[in-house]
Amino acid sequence: MQIMEPFESGFTIYSKSGCSNCTKVKKLLIEKQFFFVDISCDEFLIEDKEQFLLFIKEKTKKDYKTFPMVFKDGKFIGGFDDVQKYFDKLLCFDENEIF
């Protein structure tokens, strides 16, 4: 079983069927006009769930088992709530503001 690595550019979403937060995070990224790659994990979960979770643990550096699993530029962000927080932090900074 070959699992795609998180992309080094843009957002990578590991999702599964029937996951409402997976749908929400994709909708949010579309609304914000961000490029993302969606990797459906249904097959991985059926074929070898243990191997998939070990792969995710290696990438996230934690025991993360909930969907979606979202990465930005190859770095783990978290799930839907974490992506919302990520965008909230971006909005806190005005790009024209000088520090």
Tell me the role of every PLM-derived stretch.
Residues 2-39:
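Local sequence-structure signature of Cys/Sec-based thiol-disulfide redox active-site neighborhoods
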Residues 60-70, 80-81:
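Structural micro-motif
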Residues 16, 42, 73:
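Structured beta-strand/turn binding interfaces of compact recognition modules in eukaryotic regulators
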Residues 20-21, 47, 78:
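Short alpha-helical
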Residues 41-63:
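Thioredoxin-like thiol-disulfide oxidoreductase module
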Residues 1-2, 85:
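Catalytic phosphate/metal-binding cores of nucleic-acid and nucleotide-processing enzymes, i.e., regions
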Residues 72-99:
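Non-catalytic, surface beta->alpha helical segment in thiol-disulfide oxidoreductase systems
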